[in-house]
């Protein structure tokens, strides 16, 4: 059973159709790494993350951010089964990468900020509420396989 209303789904999919995955993904992950520097420890292979400008200009940050948002696109197609959609990713992040599931919530909140910046007046309080519900659902699904 889905917690998403028809209005939520419309708000999420309508805005998603306008999102540039590469730009928004890179900015979202970059902001996460700048604002919450302890998250950098998961990205040792990305090279220099020594300053905000190094992070925001890092091609590996941009590429992984795009990968994250591409995965989010799958969630948007499967809003009624977020746990099923993210089952394997939850296992990977839990068992192999040992990522604290709280980081998924932080990333979702940063994404909402980036969407607000990129979409201005179109990002109404109602649209924000739908997106907050969605990123909270994704964070919960990604944390679902943790022991």
UniProtKB/Swiss-Prot annotation:
Modified residues (Phosphothreonine): 13
InterPro entries per record: Globin, Globin-like_sf, Globin/Proto, Hemoglobin_b, Hemoglobin_oxygen_transport
Binding sites annotated in the UniProt record for heme b: 64, 93
GO biological process, one term: hydrogen peroxide catabolic process
Entry keyword annotation includes rRNA-binding: no
Gene Ontology cellular-component annotations: blood microparticle; haptoglobin-hemoglobin complex; hemoglobin complex
CDD domains listed in its UniProt record: Hb-beta-like
Similarity remark: Belongs to the globin family.
Name by which UniProt lists this protein: Hemoglobin subunit gamma-1
Native organism: Sapajus apella (Brown-capped capuchin)
